[in-house]
Amino acid sequence: MDQELPDGLREEIKKIALQHPEVLNLHELRTRSSGRQIFIQLHLEMDGELKLREAHQIANEVEIEICREFPNAEVIIHEDMEGLHGDESRE
C-alpha cells in the first residue's frame, strides 16, 4: 500500500533542496512510497528574474542531489518565482 514518507525523510528532502544557493524556498512537497519505489514532487521558489533555462538547470541540479540520497526516487520539480505562494512555503 502506498504511504507518505516519514517526517525525517521529508525533512531530509527539504534540506537537500534548500542547500542549493539559488533555491530561496520550497512548497507543496508531496511524497509517497510504493514498495521500494519513492515518488517525490515539490515546487522550488527562485528569483523571478532568472531565465527559464537557469531555473530549469537549478531544478535539475536539485533533482540530481535528491536522487543521490534517494536512488529509488522518481522526482518531479516545478519551478516557481519566490513569494508566489505566500504562507504555503516550506511545506
Language model segments and positions:
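Alpha-helical transmembrane segments and adjacent TM-loop junctions that form the membrane-embedded core
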Residues: 1-91
